[in-house]
Structure formats: C-alpha cells, structure tokens
Amino acid sequence: MNSTNSTNSTTTATSTNTSTQQVVTSLVSNGTIFGVFVIAFLILRIKLKRIYEPKSSFNLINEEKKPEPLPQGVWQWLKPLLKKSDNFVIQQAGLDGYFFLRYLFIIAIYCAVSMSYIFPILLSINASNGNHESGLNQLAYQNVKHRGRYFAHVFCGWIFFWGFLYIIYRELYFYTSMKQAVLASPRYAKKLSSRTVLFQTVPKQYLSEEEFSKLFDGVKRVWIARGSGSIEAMVKARDNMAIQLEGAETKYLKAALKKIKKLNKKSPQLSVSDNIAEYVPDKKRPHHKINKVAKFFFGKKVDTISYIKEELPKLNQKVKALQEDHENSSPFNSVFVEFESQYQAQVAAQITTYHAPLFMTPVYIGIEPSDVVWFNLRMFWWERLGREVSAVSAIVALVILWAFPVAFVGMISNITSLTNEVKWLKFIYKLPKQLLGLLTSLAPTVALAVLMSFLPKFIRGMAITQGAPSKQNVEYFTQQAYFAFQVIQVFLVTTLSSAATSTVTEIVKEPTKAMDLLASNLPKASNFFMSYVILQGLSISSGALLQIVPLILFYVLGAFLDGTVRKKWNRFCGLSSMQWGTAFPVYTNLAVITFSYSIISPLILLFAAVAFFLLYIAYLYNLTYVYQESPDARGIYYPRALFQTIVGIYIGQICLLGLFAVGKGWGPIVLQVIGICVTVLIHLHLSAAFDHLSKVIPVDTMKPLDGVSDTPSFKNIYKGIESTKVKKNTFGANIDMDGIKELPEFPIKKYHKRSESVTEQQVENSIFSENTFEYQFNPANEANADGHAINAENLIEDVPLLADGDTMKIPPAPWWKRFLKPHIYYSYKAVKSRLPEIYGLVDPDERVNDFDISHAYDYPAVSAQCPELWIPRDPFGFSKLLISDVSGVVEMNDENATIDENLKFTLRDVPPPYNDVKDEANGEANGEFDTASKENNPFADPKYKEEESRSAV
C-alpha cells in the first residue's frame, strides 16, 4: 500500500512539474519568437513602406481615406497609434474593423480589471492549506481541499460572469446606436445598396417590373435577371483561357529576350531581327496539356498560343450567342428593387409581402452589386431547404471526423500521464526538460492551429452551397460554423481528451468513477490552454505585425510568381483585407476558453489580458495602415461575437457546478444553479431586446423632425402633389392634410470634434472626453434657405431627425456614472459624435450617373466582354508583332508597361480596361483599382521606384 502511494505521489509530482514546465516552455519559446518578430518589424517598417504603410505612402486608396503617416522612429509610432480616435479607426477600418478592434480591447480590459479582485481572493484561497499540489497547479481549483472555500469561487464567479453580461448589454446598446447613426448618415443613406432590396423566391406573378411595382410605394427600379444556367461558367472559362494566353505571350516574349541577351554576350554588335520566331524555336514555345481528367500523365501536349488562338474565338462565339439570347431564358426568381429612399427600402424589407409561406423570403438589404453571388439567385424554396440541410450535415460530419486528430493533439499535451498506462512511452522522461516542454506545449498548440487552418475554405464552400446570396452572407455563415468548430474541437475535445489522458490509469482500475475522475482532472487541462493563449498573444500578434507571408511574396517570391505585368500590378496595387468569418471566431473562442477557466484557474486571466492587448495593437496597426476594407457587412459580426462569448460563461458555470458536485459542496451547488438560471434569464432578455433592433434602421433615425422635409434616408414621395388638401395613404384611405399640423422646431444638441479652443472644464464634462464634447445648439449658426442647420465642417445639410428631438440636455458625469448609464451616454445622439467627417459626404465611389445606376444590378455574365490582354513593351518591337498576331482573336496592348533586356518589368500606369476577372494564380480580382488612384498614378511616385529597387522583381 505504501509503495502504491509512493508511486502515485511520484506520478503526481512528475505530472505537476511537467505541466508547469509546459507553460514555462511555451512562454519562453513564444516570447523568443515575439522578440525576434517585433525587432524585425521595427527595423523593416522604416524602409519597406509597401508592406508596412501602403495606405499612407502610396496612392492606392481614395485620398479622403489616406491616413497621415506615423512617426518614423523605432518606438515613436506606438503612442500616436494608441491615441487614434474612434472616428479615425472607423474611417480607416470601416464598421466591421472598428468593432473587431473594440472586441479585442474590451476582452483585454475586462480580464485586466477582473484580476484586481479575483487574484487576491482566489489565488490565496487556492494556494493555502490545500491538496499539496505544486507549481502552477497550486494556484488552481484542484488544490482546494476544504468545501467551505467553494463559496469564494461561487461569488467571484457571480461577479465575473454577470459583470461581463452587463458589458455585453452596454456593447449591444452602443452597437445599435452606432450602426443606426452610420446607416442614417449621408454617406450610407445615399448609397444605392442602402435603398435596394433583394427579394428571393419571388412567385411568377411578380417576375415582371410592372407587377412588382404594385407591391410597394416608392419603387424606382426593378432588376429581374435572365440568363442561361451555363453562361456564368462559360464566361469564366473564356476569361481564364484569355488570361492563360496573356501569360503564354509574356513567357514567349521573355524567352526571346533571354536568347538575345545570351547572344549579345557572345556578339555585342549583334543586329536584332524583328522576327521573334528566330529566337524561340517551336519546341521552346509555351506548351500545356489539355486532357483535364489525367493531364499530368496522359494529357495531350499542345502549343498554348496556337491552341488558344484557335479555341478562344469558338468559346467567345458561344458566350455571345448565350448573351444575345438571354432575354428568352427563364428569369431568376430573385429580384433587386431600388426604392426612392432608404426609408422606403427598410419598410419593404421588414413587412410581410406575400400571403403564402416560403415565398418572397429571405429578404436582404445593403448588398453591393460587386458582392452578389449570382449563382445562388435562381434557387427555389425547396432547393434552398435541401441545400441548407446538406451543408449543415456536411459540417456536422466534419466536426465528428475532425475530433480524432484533435483528440490526439490533446493527448500529446498530457502525454506524461498517459505513460502511466502505456509503459513503453516512459522513454519520454529521459528527454531533456526543454525538449519535453516543447513536446507537450509548443508542438500541440502549433499542431492545433495548423489543423484548424484547413477548415475555412471548406466552410465557405458550404456557405455558397447552402445559398448565401452575397460575400457578406458567406462570411456570416462562416462565422457561425467556424465558431462551432473552434469551441468543439479546439476547446471541448482537447479538454476532454487531455483530462481523459491524465486519468486513464485510474479509469482502467475503477471505471465506475470515470466522471468523478474526469471532473477532478479537468482543471489540469488549463495549463495547455494557457500555452494556447500565450501562442496567440505572442507569436500570432507579432506575426501579424511582421506579415511574414506578404513580405516573402513581395520581395522574394514575386520574381518567380509574377510572370506577367498584370500579376505584378496586382501584387503592388492589391491590398490585403480581413476575412471576418474566420477572424472573429478564433478570438471569440479564445475569450470562451478564458472565461471557462477564469475561476478554475485564475492565472489564465493574466495571459489573456496581455494576449488580447497585443492582438489589439497588431490589428489596430494593420487595419488602419495596411489593410483595405473587406466587403462592408455594416458591423453584423459584432453582436454575434458578443452572444457567442456567452458560451464561455455557460461552460465556466457548468464546469464549476460539476466540480462542486464532485466535492459534495451542497451550498455552493445551490448557489451555482441559481447563478446559471440568472445567466439564462439575462441571455434571453438581451436576445429579445437587441436581436431585431440590431438588424434594422428605426424610423425615427430616418424621418425628419418636421414630418415633411427630405433627409438623407427619407424622401417625401407625396411632396409636390398638386392636391394637398386630400391625399391617400399606403392603404388607399383619404388623409385630410388640413388636419395635420407641422411640429414646431426646437433646439437640437450637436456634437463636434474638439477644437483647440475647448476649455479643460468642457473636456472634463464631455460625454466622451477622449475626443468630443457636447454643447447646446446655437441658433446663430449658419442656416440655409429652409432654416435647416448647416454643418460648416463638412458642408452637408443637417436636417433634424425625430431621433434628435429630445430637448433634455445630457448631463455631464464622471466615468462611473457614464459606465452605469449606457441608455444616456451610449444613446443615438451621443454616439453620432464618433462618426468621421467623411460620413457627412457622399462616397466618391458611389454611382451617380443614371446609366450606371440603371445597370448596377444587371446580371454581369450577359454583358461580360472578353478581357483585353496586357503585355509589356520590349526594346525590339516584338510586343507589336505579338499584338498583330492575335488581333483577330482578342484585344491586346503593350501600353503603360515595359520589359528590359534583363527581363525586368516596369509599370508606368494603370492596365487596360479589364472585366474584373478572377486571376486564379494570384487570387485577386483583377482590374479593381480605385478611381482616385487612376488620377494619382502610384507609379509616378518616387517612393514606388524606391520599393522597386528593393524588390526581387
């Protein structure tokens, strides 16, 4: 018996030492990576502006969005970056980026604040007079011996979990106010997408412009797409074939120049012929295999240029035939409808339109023409249901199958416990401590990150399969599915497999106590997740700053990958962007892990606070100075992320309940059940209060205070009607206009940016003292002919809205009162002050030409032209010969780009008109170059030449 106890104590000591070594090794290894990456970033940032400050250094975005450069010093940039105001971040990152950064910052601050009361209480209780654990386990729940101490964990859990539920309430209030203010601003309200609604599963009766216009007031245009089901695939095949020809022609040209260079070395006075074929024999011309099924082994090899010259006209003719006949094709059962204003569009999107179920639904608003997934606009309701079931089933099946490799990773993280049963694994103890720590900490966390990196592409494919009509909806579906993957695989499966591994010996001996043993060993898995949080906070954040992949692609591999001038153009002018469907879930799951272990192993709060703050800095820098905006989803990912974080609260509370049950602490069990019930109640109320409100724009933020004026969101469609005595409402009833009295105007509070003349007292009394202050409306301010106030800063007419109608002054208050009263200090009027000035102006990229607007939502495939190809101009005139050779097949030119004798490309201006074809090799949408950038040629900038001298291209 004594020998058994001795063995168990030895095993426990070994396991404890290993778990501590696991965290220490992770901290050291990831800290080293962090240091190397940050030092490299600080050095390279000063020189490599295309990678680290492209938005402020080159004309790649609209001038109005171009940020001021950060200071050039090694560390001098950090303080100005952290002091950037909300309106600056919104202007640079958009709503989606702003709320992503806000999420990271809030988690970091909440973890840091929570340490102030959890550490003094729980760490001292866990560490003193307990189960004689050592190392980090001494500071965790498993070291608690006396049941009476469970009450401390209960009450700390109440404060921590319910406190964050209050934070979620504040953030949801802020989100709805901010979104309403943004969408009601002139910049968004005047967008075509804001007043255009997509109706799907439209009955045949309404698949005509005339009939559909009868359903709503204020209909301006109706787009009903028609086209063959095969035309989109055929257009893509044609465009890819044209791009293949462009690559082959460039390769052919480079082969000739390479040969001439070689001949010049032998004979410097060589006279160059104008016949390119003299320098490139037939066998050296570009070739490819055409058998799609087995082209690598049995495909027939053909001359690429000759083959495409023959096949492209045939394919182009088929495309043109389908385009000319598209009017005879069956219409899509999805309809885009433009309304006179955003108000009419919102009304149409929110009312019940059709008497039968499953028709005229789903309904979407705010989809840009460039973001439409046209493939999914022709589905019937039964097809959509079938696809949804298939997509969800495929994801569930993958979750189950993915559990096996993830469980194996969890077992590795606790492999020292597994050696108790699997004797032959005991050789691991002979490894050096540092190597053992790497094996049990860094290797599993890296393996887990690599495993999860394969999933996003599959999930996005399932999003398209189930019928997502836009890029934003693809990301929204991905956010939900990928979060489920993250929680189940990264957290739950890893936790259970790690706990099961550490108790396998005891479970084999006493199977009836399996649940008790798992519950008691569950806290030990926290050490693995501390390592995972450290990995994310140190290695991932510094890697995001250094941008290793873009750095290597641009300066090293670009010479090999950018075989055409178009690819080089895309490399230089194409800015990276975030994919929110996968970005949010990774860090939401990190918050779930932190919250789940916050009471069981409080030390994780320290690592999480540091990790989230470092991630906040990294992404703040990238989103404001490096990345361009992703397809605008208007912030829809943020409320979902907040509600998903509640999963961590539930898991944390349920785990505590299980641990109390194992320890037979009946009083804490009752209190914990009460805590869970309160959490459920709050969750339900938050969902009921904000679920609908977060998806719509309220009427009072769109309609004018006087009831008749036009606003950016509202157009009075009855204005100007001759008979003003009697009008008809939407339902045809008569309205006596004499009986309607116009409301009197009264003072409206405004919010302006802080100026240098602001006194310290005004700043102290401000609602958001960091960047704004409040003052009463001054009737002496400028006014237009109608008496409406003019905002002198942005010269946009500011018509008072119904939501501005509260005359009550928002009282100055200290920070704690502002924290406790979000209904006042996060109200619509208060939040309006955070909007950038450009939100008072119309987007310069917005369509204003009536012709462009009338064709905005036309099915692109029915009018898509064959892309115009682009090759560089060479010193010997070969490019002109190549252009004439394909003149009857496809348009091609050699303007704005040259190639020298050393095969180096030089870009001089924008490429020829191009049809936004997806370049498979580069993964970027070609031809997407901003109008402002075309006017301000980035290649005429001396900074471009500096970057070229550093580039390997």
From Swiss-Prot:
Residues 942-953 have a biased composition (Basic and acidic residues). Signal peptide: none annotated. Residues 910-953 are annotated as: Disordered. It is a multi-pass membrane protein. It is found in: Membrane. One of its GO terms (molecular function) is calcium-activated cation channel activity. The keyword Transcription does not apply. The modification Phosphoserine is found at S949. The chain crosses the membrane at residues 23-43, 103-123, 148-168, 392-412, 435-455, 481-501, 540-560, 575-595, 599-619, 642-662, 666-686. Pfam families: PHM7_cyt, PHM7_ext, RSN1_7TM, RSN1_TM. Its main location: membrane. Keywords: Calcium, Ion channel, Ion transport, Membrane, Phosphoprotein, Transmembrane, Transmembrane helix, Transport. Acts as an osmosensitive calcium-permeable cation channel. This is Uncharacterized protein RSN1. GO terms for cellular component: cell periphery; endoplasmic reticulum; fungal-type vacuole membrane; membrane; plasma membrane. InterPro entries: Csc1-like, CSC1/OSCA1-like_7TM, CSC1/OSCA1-like_cyt, Csc1/OSCA1-like_N, PHM7_ext. The gene is RSN1. Belongs to the CSC1 (TC 1.A.17) family. Coiled coil: none annotated.
